From Swiss-Prot:
Coiled coil regions in record: none
Top-rank lineage group of the source organism: Bacteria
SUPFAM superfamilies for this protein: Aldolase, post-HMGL domain-like
Catalysis performed (reactions): (S)-4-hydroxy-2-oxopentanoate = acetaldehyde + pyruvate
InterPro entries: 2-IPM_HCS-like, 4OH_2_O-val_aldolase, Aldolase_TIM, DmpG_comm, DRE_TIM_HOA, PYR_CT
Protein's name according to its UniProt entry: 4-hydroxy-2-oxovalerate aldolase 4
Organism: Rhodococcus opacus (strain B4)
Matches recorded under PROSITE patterns: PYR_CT
Transmembrane segments: none
Keyword Lyase listed: yes
Length: 347
């Protein structure tokens, strides 16, 4: 009697990129090597490494990292035996020269991230990276801001440029499972590239969103050990591995080495537990980009305005990544008038 083939999912780990945001980009190359080695031993096939915002982001605006991106990449490359090392490239922050340095340091995969309405901005780096022989994964950031069909139209552009994988990216942690499933299903109807899903956990449903995305056609799922990541953090790699296995999926990774790496290497490096606090929750509820988390907390303290009110107003204005300067504008405006917590547009 034949049995159906087990469903397969590929877990990509971003502890050493998105997780950098939780430690103020202060992982050392030795930390990177130790974590990458543990992930590699667990069978994780792709490990993303860079400043938390991506290549070239170490700056006064986004925070200075403890080392350079090439130093981080080399540390990871030297530590692994089987895994590919990837880096995040955001047009407008990184340059192709910085991507070339990452290639020289040993990356095999690049992840090109564009705002969900701006797939055109990915054409040059995607095509250039393919010419260099890289595997190219692409991110449609803030995917909650587009309905499924328009999002699929943007995905089709990235597919046409040669992307190997197109990700639905919940940058704000604003999605619930139906949102994740509907968007992935829409992409599956129009693109031939593989589909990925990148969750943030602001509404506490990062794992559920990832499972639903997979059931609707995603074959690449991002996670980070201990959930390390911007604001409320990402779907937790070791929990993803356990949940997918329980749901009947073949992840190709070994759960116990993942847990050991999370527990004994990552946890001692954490500045604080990765939790859904008030600011993280409202950030997801308001649909604001995850990098606004710490600057909003600082502005709230400086201006004596509740962080949630700042975030609700930013959500009403529809801000996106790169508009962090709006935080100060909104905080100062709210501090100068009598206000009530603003409602979301359309609510």
């Amino acid at each position: 009697m034949n049995t159906p083939a087990q469903k397969k999912i590929t877990i990509v780990d971003t502890t050493l990129r998105d997780g950098m945001s939780s430690v103020s980009h202060q992982f050392t190359p030795q930390n990177v090597a130790d974590i990458a080695r543990g992930l590699d031993k667990a069978g994780v096939g792709t490990i993303e490494v860079a400043h938390g915002i991506g290549l070239g982001a170490s700056s006064i605006q986004y925070g200075f990292a403890a080392a350079t991106d090439p130093d981080y990449v080399r540390a990871a490359v030297d530590a692994v035996e089987n895994a590919d090392i990837a880096a995040l490239y955001v047009p407008g922050i990184a340059t192709l020269a910085e991507l070339q340095k990452a290639i020289d340091a040993g990356i095999k995969t690049v992840r090109v991230a564009v705002h969900c309405t701006e797939a055109d901005c990915g054409q040059q780096p995607v095509e250039w990276a393919k010419e260099q022989g890289l595997t190219v994964m692409t991110f449609l950031m803030m995917s909650h801001k587009l309905d499924p069909e328009p999002l699929a139209e943007q995905a089709a552009k990235l597919d046409s440029y040669g992307a190997d994988v197109v990700y639905v990216v919940d940058s704000a942690g604003a999605m619930v499972p139906q949102h994740a499933g509907d968007r992935v299903a829409a992409l599956r109807q129009v693109i031939t590239a593989d589909i990925g899903f990148h969750a943030h956990n602001n509404l506490g449903v990062g794992i559920a969103n990832a499972l639903t995305a997979a059931e609707n056609g995603a074959t690449f799922i991002d996670g980070s050990l201990r959930g390390l990541g911007a604001s409320a953090g990402n779907a937790q790699t070791e929990v993803l591995a356990a949940a997918f296995e329980r749901a009947g999926w073949d992840t190709g990774v070994d759960l116990f080495p993942l847990i050991d790496t999370a527990e004994h290497i990552v946890a001692p490096l954490m500045k604080e537990p990765q939790i859904v606090d008030e600011t993280a929750l409202i950030l997801g509820y308001a649909g604001v980009y995850s990098t606004f988390f710490h600057p909003t907390k600082r502005a709230a303290k400086k201006f004596g305005v509740p962080a949630r009110d700042i975030l609700m107003e930013l959500g009403r204005r529809g801000v996106i990544g790169g508009q962090e300067d709006m935080i100060i504008d909104v905080a100062s405006e709210l501090a100068g008038r009598t206000y009530e917590t603003p409602a979301l547009a359309g609510s």
